[in-house]
UniProtKB/Swiss-Prot annotation:
Gene name of this polypeptide: s1pr2
Entry's family note: Belongs to the G-protein coupled receptor 1 family.
Membrane-spanning ranges: 58-78, 88-108, 129-149, 168-193, 220-230, 255-275, 290-310
Membrane side Extracellular: residue ranges: 1-57, 109-128, 194-219, 276-289
Listed name of the protein: Sphingosine 1-phosphate receptor 2
S-palmitoyl cysteine lipid modification positions: 325
Pathology linked to this chain's protein: Defects in s1pr2 are a cause of heart development abnormality named miles apart (mil). In all vertebrates, the myocardial progenitors involute early during gastrulation and come to occupy bilateral positions in the anterior lateral plate mesoderm (LPM). During somitogenesis, these cells undergo a second phase of migration toward the midline and fuse to form the definitive heart tube. Defects in S1PR2 disrupt this process, leading to the formation of two laterally positioned hearts (cardia bifida).
Amino acid sequence: MTTCRLFAGFCQAVTMSKYSQYFNKTLIQVHYLTAKEMTAEELRDRIESKQSLSSLNILFVVICSIIILENLLVLIAVFRNKKFHSAMFFFIGNLAFSDLLAGSAYIANIFLSGPRTFHLTPVQWFIREGTAFIALSASVFSLLAIAIERYIAITKVKVYGSNKTCRMFLLIGACWVMSILLGGLPIIGWNCINNLDDCSAVLPLNTRYYIRFVVTIFSIILLSIVILYVRIYLIVRTSHQEATNSPAYALLKTVTIVLGVFIICWLPAFTILLLDTSCKMKQCPILNNAGIFFSFATLNSALNPLIYTLRSKDMRKEFLRVLCCWGLLNCGRPPHRCMVPLKSSSSMEHCTNKHEHQSIPIMQDCTTCV
């Protein structure tokens, strides 16, 4: 009843279609007041506060800017160097693009959070949060695609055939279609507008059932990826001893590290989301600090390019070339030759299919161990 006195206009519209309320700014205030169990005074203070960016937010804006630049470097490296024009590296490029999107989405989230949240319409709020979910979904699906590609490469299953490139890009496209669909479910209609009792405390316009569904889907996918990698390791261990020193095995170790870092960074955030589905704000005060856990998860997007750089000699060289071209390093490279695509006779296809390509020079030149 108190809520209705404060927001009489909302109570009159509560029986209307949820889509007709997508541009009602009052709706945001009602959902935050109810889901976060705030008093009217607390809500008013948050709306009227002139909060500037905190030092922590400024730090994460800097980190996200680094994330964008790092992953842009990965994309440029994959595009320029013919050695990286293989299924594996295109999937890594896809992961880099999702990380770049995550960095951009988090910057937007920082600038649209705090008191600014209450000046958003529901549709703007759904776009703000949905973009972050799309980036997360794309990362998870990219990791699944990489695991499938590694399994195919190790077991030498011939599934690509003559249409290898076409099928590879179809798989990447499917990753993004599924990600956009998953992140767009709330704005399509799976939200808690007109049903305040089901609202998430962390994401007050999303229903708890959607949060539970997303976390369940991600958990199943990550478990499937772990099973695939366990299967791959068993195959490698039982194969010829030489395989453990091959570039393909080094590549396998790198993507396993990427998976492990992803799980470590995102596990606290997933735990908070699961807690949110079964616990009210006053019963679980830790939900008030959910932003810290999501900030920690964002670090995953900054670590992936560092893993590629530390694990791959070719990737390090390519990063240095791009930095030289941008004038950040003095390498004495002629400017007109800076962005010329590099050609290489070796590729990860040669590394992966060692038994099919016995040419010694090719194997000696193949130093990519991402």
